[in-house]
Amino acid sequence: MIYVSKPAIISAAGSSSDENLSSLLSGKRFLSKSSEFHPQNEFLVGKFNGVLPSFSNKTKEHFKTRTNALLLSTMLEIDAEIKRAIKKYGKSRVGVVLGTTTSGVEENFEPFKGYIATGFFDKSRFDINRNCLANVAEFVSDFYELSGPSYCVSTACTSGVKAVIEAKRLIESELCDAVICGGVDSLNTLTINGFNSLSILSSAPSQAFSKNREGINIGEGAGLFLLSRDEISNVAVASSASNCDAFHMTQPDFSAKMAISCIEEALKKAGIDGVDYVNLHGTGTQANDKMEAKAVNLTLGATFASTIKPQIGHTLGAAGAIESAICAMLCMDENSTLPPHVYDGEYDESLEAVNLVKSGTKFDVKTAMSLSFAFGGDNAAIIFKRVR
């Protein structure tokens, strides 16, 4: 059995896991308007507006990015647990697997802005090492002087959860005894304008599963765990599953057959027929919500369900990790208040029925599933369970 530490979270809703969970339970939205990513457009984003930790003088220059600053915040939150694992197992037996889609792309965009404005490209301000997706995993390994397996997963919006799945496999295969895992992404010009070009960004707060939904709001953040073969908490990863639609690069298969297969596989591996709570991918796009409602209805029925993206934005490579962290925390508490599904209350009746959580709903969550669906038809599901 692979156990999970109490997770660390940073997002627009706060700088710790406890603050994030409390903020999400309030039902408030933590989105703000920003014009810093396009001179003519103002976007509604989930930006962390607090103070980020500073890098030490020993930190290599290509690690000094906003993405890694968000990650560092979560590292420091579970620092004691990480150091205990390193002391017990040794630096070669602790691995790092992280999901990301951005790495240091915004910092490397600065010289391009200069070129657009002046016609001069300052090569001294561009470092390809910032852009490498492995940058975030290398940062963690360098910070703790680890020599175990260290790599990144970048499968768009499933990156964060698939990093946790990979970490579990590393321990099961006996390549590691503990793994630091999760996901991190920061707001940046490239990603926001890329999504805008697909016409799926909403100028208003996201209304997932509403008949009035217009699209997503982008956010930033990080979710981090320590996974271990030791019983470091009362919650373990019960199972996971992933597959691919092989249908379309930016749209899901509306038959939902592969999403259904993914959910069913995760349930089968866990040896259960259902879960107490499911965290929905819930982007608020026409395509995702249509497919996801069908998949959830046909596999999980009236299970309590909600998405946190309308509150903190879609954090992309961090989303699956943050949402997995919330699921794990719910399992750790014997009398959980469930995260409410925040929207305008006008459910799209053309969708299959989903039991969206109302504010103040309490339930003893012993099992919780998190769902992630990505561009390229990539699907992932993970189940956490309370073991004592």
Question: How would you name each of these model-derived features?
Answer:
Residues 1-4, 64-80, 84-90:
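N-terminal amphipathic, basic-rich helices that act as targeting or association modules
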Residues 2-7, 18, 22-36, 40-44, ...:
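Condensing-enzyme catalytic core mediating Claisen C-C bond formation in acyl metabolism
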Residues 6, 24, 96, 140, ...:
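Conserved small-residue
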Residues 1-60, 230-238, 325-341, 380, ...:
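ACP-dependent fatty acid/polyketide chain-elongation machinery
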